[in-house]
């Protein structure tokens, strides 16, 4: 396989990660400290503390406005958040493939979730769900138009759900690629290259934040759609 490292969209080729095992190596090296046992049997291990604290913070942020009806879905939404967040962060490793930058994956996750919560809503309260298509106080002559508009808005939810995640990650990776190319091009001028490298460093930190925020937004929107149907 011929790899074109100068291609701006070459990083989004799915088969790159299969030929470069450094991605998994870096992950295992960074997480190897979790396997170190604690000398005391009375205290929780590092892995238990990390998982527990992360789980509590995720639940606190994601589900602080969750109503009791959506409580059975908390574990599923937490798993979805961890899955998307892990894929986003691992995609920042060198030559790694960010699968969430492809709408084929984001729609494969978002559309079934959207369909499941809406089918559940129509199954539990069919008349109430139909009533949402006509806002309260709508004049009678506007009801047909409002039904069409609300129906289009309803079916636009899964499109926006998957497209938002893929578009933001793609834009962030393209910016990182362009800046790294600029650093290499301007390497003959140390002063300009150092400034560009500093900008690249802060942009990389911002991209880590975007990876977390996009996982949160995706999960929060699915949780919001569920709360509308219960």
From Swiss-Prot:
Species, as recorded: Patiria pectinifera (Starfish)
SUPFAM superfamilies, per database record: F1F0 ATP synthase subunit A
One Pfam match: ATP-synt_A
Complexes and interactors: F-type ATPases have 2 components, CF(1) - the catalytic core - and CF(0) - the membrane proton channel. CF(1) has five subunits: alpha(3), beta(3), gamma(1), delta(1), epsilon(1). CF(0) has three main subunits: a, b and c.
TM annotation in the entry: 16-36, 73-93, 106-126, 142-162, 165-185, 192-212
InterPro entries for the chain: ATP_synth_F0_asu, ATP_synth_F0_asu_AS, ATP_synth_F0_asu_bact/mt, F0_ATP_A_sf
A Gene Ontology term for the protein's cellular component: proton-transporting ATP synthase complex
UniProt KW keywords: ATP synthesis, CF(0), Hydrogen ion transport, Ion transport, Membrane, Mitochondrion, Mitochondrion inner membrane, Transmembrane, Transmembrane helix, Transport
Membrane topology: Multi-pass membrane protein
Function of the protein: Mitochondrial membrane ATP synthase (F(1)F(0) ATP synthase or Complex V) produces ATP from ADP in the presence of a proton gradient across the membrane which is generated by electron transport complexes of the respiratory chain. F-type ATPases consist of two structural domains, F(1) - containing the extramembraneous catalytic core and F(0) - containing the membrane proton channel, linked together by a central stalk and a peripheral stalk. During catalysis, ATP synthesis in the catalytic domain of F(1) is coupled via a rotary mechanism of the central stalk subunits to proton translocation.
Gene3D superfamilies: ATP synthase, F0 complex, subunit A (1.20.120.220)
PROSITE patterns in the record: ATPASE_A
Name by which UniProt lists this protein: ATP synthase subunit a
Example of a GO MF term: proton-transporting ATP synthase activity, rotational mechanism
Localization (cell): Mitochondrion inner membrane
Gene name per UniProt: ATP6
Family, similarity comment: Belongs to the ATPase A chain family.
